[in-house]
Regions:
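Signature of dsDNA virion morphogenesis modules
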Residues: 1-195
C-alpha cells in the first residue's frame, strides 16, 4: 500500500434515498481480494451441485481498496458503521436478491437468492466463522443459492471468484491525522492476523 495516496471513506446516508447499495455482483477480481467459497454438507471446500451455494466476503471492513480514476490514484475503505448502514439499507429496500455478473446491468442473475448475511461484530459476540477467521471486525459475509447452472458453473470453475457491491455512496477524504491513525490501525490489524 502506497502511503502517499489519499484515503476516502465510503458510506451511505440512511436519510438520503439517493445513496444506496443496489446490487451485489459476482466478479472475477473482487477489489477486496477475497475469493468466495462453495460448501458441501460434509467437506468444507468441495462443491455440492445440489446446494449450489457460494459464500464469501461482500465487504471487508477497513480494507484499503486501490482505485484509479483518470489521473487520480487513491484508496477507499468501508468502516464498520458504514457496513452496518449498508445492511439496514439492503433490508429496507429489499435488495438482498439483486445479483449480477461483473457489474453489468444487462447480466442480472434472476435465479439467485441470498440465504445468509452475517456481519462480524466482536463486541456483540458475532465473531468471524473459522473459515473467515482473518476477516476484520465489521466485515460482511454473504451466501447465495444460485439456481442458474451456467452462473454457478462459472463460479465453480474459478471464472467468477468473489463478490463486489455496487451503489451510490457518500465519499469523504479522511483527514491526515485520521489517515495516519487509520494506517497505523490497519498495520496493527495485519500484524495481529499474522500471529
Amino acid at each position: 500500500m502506497r502511503k502517499d495516496l489519499p484515503i476516502y471513506r465510503i458510506s451511505i446516508d440512511l436519510e438520503n434515498p439517493k445513496t444506496t447499495v443496489s446490487f451485489n455482483s459476482l466478479v472475477s477480481n473482487p477489489a477486496h481480494e477475497k475469493s468466495f467459497q462453495t460448501f458441501s454438507k460434509v467437506q468444507r471446500y468441495e462443491f455440492n451441485d445440489e446446494k449450489q451455494i457460494v459464500t464469501g466476503v461482500a465487504i471487508s471492513a477497513d480494507f484499503p481498496i486501490y482505485r484509479k480514476q483518470g489521473n487520480e490514484e487513491f484508496y477507499v475503505v468501508f468502516d464498520k458503521q458504514a457496513i452496518s448502514d449498508i445492511v439496514v439499507d439492503y433490508a429496507r429496500k429489499g435488495n438482498f436478491n439483486n445479483l449480477n455478473v461483473e457489474h453489468k446491468s444487462n447480466d442480472v442473475v434472476n435465479n439467485a437468492f441470498m440465504v445468509m448475511l452475517y456481519q462480524i461484530d466482536n463486541e456483540k459476540g458475532f465473531t468471524a466463522p473459522e473459515r473467515f477467521k482473518d476477516e476484520s471486525d465489521g466485515s460482511l459475509l454473504v451466501s447465495y443459492k444460485i439456481l442458474d447452472k451456467e452462473v454457478y458453473e462459472r463460479a465453480k470453475n474459478g471464472e467468477l471468484t468473489g463478490f463486489s457491491i455496487e451503489g451510490d455512496f457518500v465519499i469523504e477524504e479522511l483527514m491526515k491525522e485520521t489517515e495516519n491513525e487509520f494506517l497505523t490501525q490497519v498495520i496493527e490489524d495485519l500484524k495481529s492476523m499474522l500471529k
